Amino acid sequence: MKRTRDEVDATLQIAKLNAAELLPAVHCLGFGPGASGAAAGDFCLLELEPTLCQQLEDGHSLVIRGDKDEQAVLCSKDKTYDLKIADTSNMLLFIPGCKTPDQLKKEDSHCNIIHTEIFGFSNNYWELRRRRPKLKKLKKLLMENPYEGPDSQKEKDSNSSKYTTEDLLDQIQASEEEIMTQLQVLNACKIGGYWRILEFDYEMKLLNHVTQLVDSESWSFGKVPLNTCLQELGPLEPEEMIEHCLKCYGKKYVDEGEVYFELDADKICRAAARMLLQNAVKFNLAEFQEVWQQSVPEGMVTSLDQLKGLALVDRHSRPEIIFLLKVDDLPEDNQERFNSLFSLREKWTEEDIAPYIQDLCGEKQTIGALLTKYSHSSMQNGVKVYNSRRPIS
């Protein structure tokens, strides 16, 4: 039954509201035939920040990603968000075409009664919270079948695991841009339309070909010509693999129309250290540093600073030792990461632990804030150290 203006005025009097202080237009709400279905969960409300609204209005998509055993996340083209249900104390009404007070002010309305049909209602909505992308699974998938070279028997096995970009977008809880960035970090490349990580021994084989050629030709590490590399090394390995190796360990540039690569000494020294450390549980630090320096190309200088997030030095053992500890092998969850680190070593200096928690920092979070939340600090021999806030089993 539709209300008349007299009934509306009578209601205002009962509520002791002054009509002069209100907009003249009146919404009279009534439930439509579809309201019960909408309230039963056929629809849900999603609160979006202005930039995401603009992306939708521009024709872009937002994607919800996650397997059945994972907490769903929402992804834009370049960001990842947690989805959280927020309950409300007031009923939220779905009213198609409902005009806001600002819209009504712009209209020439004289005591209009607007009969509005409620399409549905809800006591909660989904809200988004920016989060780090869940990228650990990406390396796990690609390491199921690392690329060992064109002559590997595994390449002839049609049942081996391989993933296209679409496969990764379907399985990784991260935005497309974040996935593509991480593929670069992992030094992944496309082979036959599938993303692959090079098996480390094969990667080092390629790198040795390049550094030996640089040495034999007496080139500067800052100016390695691409075309000559491909011509000389092409008979040994596929040209696309040689170029990929140069991209992984150097920076591409053009000089007088020719393509060159400036090799990164830190990356090459780091790779050589990993090669030495991966076959030893622990390595005498002094002996390691001597062998390491001998294993890198002449002219490059090794430094322990090159090994942050790759290896850890134990200064308290006698003799001092070094061992492999890769940050990408540690848990992705904050608390699990700290538990893992504190089970390995009871007390850490900030200098030692920083490379292993840097990737946990959010947009506005610092290493100091993470340490305050997950550890206690104390002084030991004049040096600030950090230990776990909770017992480690």
UniProtKB/Swiss-Prot annotation:
Which BP terms in the Gene Ontology apply to this protein? DNA replication; maintenance of mitotic sister chromatid cohesion; positive regulation of DNA-directed DNA polymerase activity; post-translational protein acetylation; regulation of DNA replication
- GO cellular component terms, A-Z: chromatin; chromosome, centromeric region; Ctf18 RFC-like complex; nucleoplasm
State one molecular function term (GO): DNA binding
Any Pfam family the entry gives: Dcc1
* Compartment(s) where it occurs, according to its Swiss-Prot or TrEMBL record: Nucleus
Cytoplasm among keywords: no
Q: Which InterPro entries match?
A: Dcc1
Q: Which UniProt keywords apply?
A: Cell cycle, DNA replication, DNA-binding, Nucleus
Protein family (similarity comment) = Belongs to the DCC1 family.
Q: How does it assemble?
A: Component of the CTF18-RFC complex which consists of CTF8, CTF18, DSCC1 and the RFC complex. Interacts with CTF8 and CTF18. Interacts with DDX11.
Q: What does this protein do?
A: Loads PCNA onto primed templates regulating velocity, spacing and restart activity of replication forks. May couple DNA replication to sister chromatid cohesion through regulation of the acetylation of the cohesin subunit SMC3.
Protein name, UniProt field: Sister chromatid cohesion protein DCC1
Q: Provide the organism lineage as a comma list.
A: Eukaryota, Metazoa, Chordata, Craniata, Vertebrata
Gene symbol of the encoding locus = DSCC1
